[in-house]
């Protein structure tokens, strides 16, 4: 079961997550991360093997990724996967205490892919730009949704506005997932953003915060594509609510307040706003968001 690590966390936070998840194997890229792991290796209780990609073979404890692969069996594992098997464990920071590990099952991920694709229909063939960090729920739904329809994933390690714009224009990208701040950065900091042609770009999806009407309108004018929004959290794979491209057009043309909404509940999902005693609240009241659906973690 993979456990993606946020590379921005402190070493001791890494140690906590690695131990709490009972991980047996660590795979890192490059010497920077292998050096950091070596500094905490004495604290790691369950790790049996350390693997590094692009290693210069001089780091203690670490084995080369490709050597490790070549030594592995070509036989299909004698394992029958069912809907209740774990797919991954992703850590999310709570309001207090240590990060919490959300365990997502095969049925959770499959359900959320179906919900995502039902509201935000992807073009076929599909080719997505994955620039959201891969320890984040947004990256998971972007990646899994594309894989589910046999699409291609183009990965960029870091968010660099010029690189993102160039990729959207030149790599036949059909869709991507960004946050509004990333969209805004592409619009204001890339000199050629408006002069490029984005002939294959069909959709940009966003989340994490509302998008300003002026940002959305400018993005629609520049990229000439549809926009969709997802709202959710790590514990729900990715989304519990979605706002369709049609609703974004309506927001721009007649009702900008729609952009303050997190969208409508995904199919097979119940969403309520409740008070501290779990009582449902009327429209317009502030409370806690409660959700029930097949995408919720076990």
Which residues fall in each region the model found?
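Short beta-strand->loop structural element characteristic of the AMP-binding/adenylate-forming
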Residues: 1-27, 101-103, 152-158, 228
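Hydrophobic alpha-helical segments in the ANL/AMP-binding
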Residues: 1-5, 14-15, 116-118, 137-149, ...
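ANL superfamily adenylate-forming
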Residues: 25, 32-84, 190
């Amino acid at each position: 079961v993979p456990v993606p690590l946020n590379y921005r966390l402190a070493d001791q936070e890494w140690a906590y997550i690695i131990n709490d998840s009972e991980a047996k194997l660590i795979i890192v890229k490059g010497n920077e991360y292998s050096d950091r792991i070596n500094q905490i290796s004495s604290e790691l209780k369950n790790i049996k093997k350390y693997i590094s990609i692009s290693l210069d073979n001089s780091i203690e404890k670490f084995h080369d990724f490709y050597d490790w692969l070549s030594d592995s069996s070509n036989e299909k594992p004698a394992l029958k996967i069912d809907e209740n098997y774990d797919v991954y464990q992703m850590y999310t920071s709570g309001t207090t205490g240590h990060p919490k590990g959300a365990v997502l099952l095969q049925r959770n991920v499959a359900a959320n892919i179906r919900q995502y694709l039902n509201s935000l229909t992807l073009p076929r063939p599909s080719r997505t730009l994955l620039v959201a960090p891969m320890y984040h729920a947004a990256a998971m739904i972007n990646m899994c949704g594309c894989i589910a329809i046999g699409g291609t994933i183009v990965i960029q390690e870091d968010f660099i506005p010029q690189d993102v714009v160039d990729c959207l224009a030149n790599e036949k990208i059909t869709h991507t997932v960004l946050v509004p701040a990333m969209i805004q950065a592409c619009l204001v900091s890339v000199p050629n953003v408006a002069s490029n042609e984005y002939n294959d770009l069909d959709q940009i999806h966003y989340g994490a915060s509302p998008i300003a009407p002026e940002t959305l309108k400018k993005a629609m004018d520049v990229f000439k594509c549809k926009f969709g929004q997802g709202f959710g959290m790590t514990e729900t794979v990715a989304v519990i609510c979605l706002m369709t491209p049609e609703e974004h057009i309506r927001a721009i043309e007649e009702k900008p307040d729609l952009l303050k909404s997190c969208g409508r509940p995904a199919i097979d999902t119940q969403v309520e706003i409740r008070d501290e005693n779990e009582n449902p609240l009327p429209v317009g009241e502030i409370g806690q968001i409660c959700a029930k659906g097949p995408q919720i973690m076990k």
